[in-house]
Amino acid sequence: GDERASSRDIVLCLDVSGSTLPYDREVIDTYLELVKHFEGERIGLSIFNSTSRTVFPLTDDYELVTKQLTSASKALKGESQDDIDKMSDAEYQDIANWLEGTQNRKDATSLIGDGVVSCAAMLPGFAYGEANHANADRQRAASIVLATDNVVSGKPTYSLTEALDLTQQTKITVDGLYSGPKASESDQTTTDMKSAIESHGGIFLTQSNGASIDELVRDIQSRRDTDVENKAKSSMVDAPGLWTLALAVILIIWIVCAWRLRR
């Protein structure tokens, strides 16, 4: 419906270090399906390793989104070790082209906090290094879907917690999708990510309950849609100005009519 339409901004924030790439393709493929049902939501995609690249900015041009996600999915289709060994030079070049700009710092990979800050900068009202309180009252719900295994190598400018502090101040919700092998779901890095995301009001999901990446992405999407609908309903209840105005107009009309009748 129109009430839900045009009320949400989503940035897909994908860690593209080697260990997470196979999971990135699943996230991308799920959004390729979800975007068919979007009505006014704006979506953007940023990928990061030691540095970030905006694949496409926040937009509701779903033709462009579909084209970009399709080419990303095709580029990543060879992303398992077995497939990499069989890849043609052209396929390898496709992946290299897609990842260009994400590894511009030496001796560092997967700088997750920095990646989140770059993703947040794609949303209105966020400035690097500070939360812009003037724009904290959002017209549209803003959320980041962060897919990573939270394994940092190197020294980031922002830790994940520092990045989440900034997004929280500007009312950007960050939901976390664990993109790594099930065997590592109980690792300290994973439990740290879970506590950081959840303590900042985000949803954190892993595949440990048997759900696929597709199901996890759909779960986050569904929960956030419900949040937006609930906020829209509560804003109608919390903004009695229209009702007060309508009652005042009716009362004035009634007084005028009563006065005329008495004459």
Specify the residue positions occupied by each region the protein language model found:
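C-terminal signal-anchor/stop-transfer transmembrane helix together with its immediate cytosolic
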Residues: 1, 226-263
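…and closely analogous acidic/polar surface helices at protein-protein or active-site interfaces
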Residues: 3-10, 18-49, 56-70
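Juxtamembrane amphipathic/hinge helix adjacent to a transmembrane helix
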Residues: 9, 196-238
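Residues that scaffold, gate, or flank divalent-cation-dependent active/transport sites
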Residues: 15
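Extracytoplasmic/secreted cell-surface and envelope-processing proteins
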Residues: 21-22, 53-57, 152-158, 184-188, ...
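Sec-exported extracytoplasmic/periplasmic mature domains
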Residues: 32-40, 70-74, 120-128, 168-169, ...
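Short beta-strand-loop
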Residues: 44-99, 190-194
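VWA/integrin I-like adhesion module and closely mimicked acidic/polar interface patches used
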Residues: 104-110, 114, 118-122, 126-143, ...
